[in-house]
């Protein structure tokens, strides 16, 4: 038999929808939008590191991080 705790009783409503699937697309468009924003963030970071995107007073040098 499982141990019943106060925390378990508080969290039980969160697990009551187990196995059910939201109808339609659900939150898929929101997830896609967040993935797109994350991709753009990574792309900008890569361009800064590769010096493809030139920003004034931004040195891409490990030695400059210690100053």
Swiss-Prot record:
Transmembrane segments annotated in the record for this chain: 29-49
Function: One of the components of the core complex of photosystem II (PSII), required for its stability and/or assembly. PSII is a light-driven water:plastoquinone oxidoreductase that uses light energy to abstract electrons from H(2)O, generating O(2) and a proton gradient subsequently used for ATP formation. It consists of a core antenna complex that captures photons, and an electron transfer chain that converts photonic excitation into a charge separation.
Species: Guillardia theta (Cryptophyte)
InterPro entries, per the entry: PSII_PsbH, PSII_PsbH_sf
Gene Ontology BP annotations: photosynthesis; protein stabilization
Protein name (database record): Photosystem II reaction center protein H
Entry's family note: Belongs to the PsbH family.
Alphabetized Pfam families for the sequence: PsbH (PF00737)
Location(s), subcellular: Plastid, Chloroplast thylakoid membrane
GO molecular function: phosphate ion binding
Keyword tags: Chloroplast, Membrane, Photosynthesis, Photosystem II, Plastid, Thylakoid, Transmembrane, Transmembrane helix
GO CC annotation: chloroplast thylakoid membrane; photosystem II
Membrane topology label: Single-pass membrane protein
Keyword Membrane attached: yes
Gene name as annotated: psbH
Subunit (UniProt): PSII is composed of 1 copy each of membrane proteins PsbA, PsbB, PsbC, PsbD, PsbE, PsbF, PsbH, PsbI, PsbJ, PsbK, PsbL, PsbM, PsbT, PsbX, PsbY, PsbZ, Psb30/Ycf12, at least 3 peripheral proteins of the oxygen-evolving complex and a large number of cofactors. It forms dimeric complexes.
């Amino acid at each position: 038999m499982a141990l019943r705790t106060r925390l378990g009783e508080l969290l039980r409503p969160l697990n009551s929808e187990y196995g059910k699937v939201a109808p339609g697309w659900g939150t898929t468009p929101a997830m896609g939008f967040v993935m797109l924003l994350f991709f753009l963030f990574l792309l900008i970071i890569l361009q800064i590191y590769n010096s493809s995107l030139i920003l004034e007073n931004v040195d891409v040098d490990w030695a400059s991080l210690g100053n």
